[in-house]
Amino acid sequence: MSFFVQKLSEKATIPTKGSANSAGYDLYAAAECIVPRRGKVLVDTDLAIAVPEGTYGRVAPRSGLASKHSIDTGAGVIDADYRGHVRVLLFNYSDVDFPIKVGDRIAQLILERIVNPPVILVESLEATVRGANGFGSTGV
């Protein structure tokens, strides 16, 4: 199984894996920008991708950026039929601006399988021990 990548500019970097067993492919910035403190920014990758049918690409944070700089990702779903420019939404939860340079690893792309069962309308759902008990109901 492969996925296809198109470079939209010379500044784009093809996704890479940190090791053979890495779950994700590193995504790289194609433009300089600042992730403002307590703010967000869309970072260009200058890539278009085609993930295999039956999968989607999930844009996930890089653990080092999250743990050392409080940088997180958001809105990170790339559908199998999307062919547009891939941008990464980064959030900065710290109190200092975070600079991004061309070629910086900014996120990771994880390919995940999709299950698409039919939606069935029912009058009520089958009862369970948990029932409708929500947040914190199974412990902290």
Swiss-Prot record:
Q: List the EC numbers from the record.
A: 3.6.1.23
Keyword S-adenosyl-L-methionine (UniProt): no
Q: Which domain of life is it from?
A: Eukaryota
InterPro entries linked: dUTPase, dUTPase-like, dUTPase-like_sf, dUTPase_trimeric
Question: What pathway annotation does it carry?
Answer: Pyrimidine metabolism; dUMP biosynthesis; dUMP from dCTP (dUTP route): step 2/2
**Residues holding substrate:** R62, S63, G64, G76, V77, I78, D79, R130, F135, G136
What are the required cofactors?
Mg(2+)
Keyword field: Hydrolase, Magnesium, Metal-binding, Nucleotide metabolism
GO BP terms, alphabetized: dITP catabolic process; dUMP biosynthetic process; dUTP catabolic process
The keyword Magnesium is assigned to this record? yes
CDD domains attached to this UniProt entry: trimeric_dUTPase (cd07557)
Question: Reaction catalysed?
Answer: dUTP + H2O = dUMP + diphosphate + H(+)
Give the Pfam families listed for this entry. dUTPase
- Care to name a GO molecular-function term for this sequence? magnesium ion binding
This protein's GO CC annotations? cytosol; nucleus
- Going by the record, the broad EC class of this enzyme is hydrolase
The record ties this protein, via SUPFAM superfamilies, to: dUTPase-like (SSF51283)
Q: What does this protein do?
A: This enzyme is involved in nucleotide metabolism: it produces dUMP, the immediate precursor of thymidine nucleotides and it decreases the intracellular concentration of dUTP so that uracil cannot be incorporated into DNA.
Similarity annotation = Belongs to the dUTPase family.
Identify the NCBIfam families for this entry.
dut (TIGR00576), PRK00601.1 (NF001862)
**Protein name per Swiss-Prot or TrEMBL:** Probable deoxyuridine 5'-triphosphate nucleotidohydrolase
Source organism of the structure: Schizosaccharomyces pombe (strain 972 / ATCC 24843) (Fission yeast)
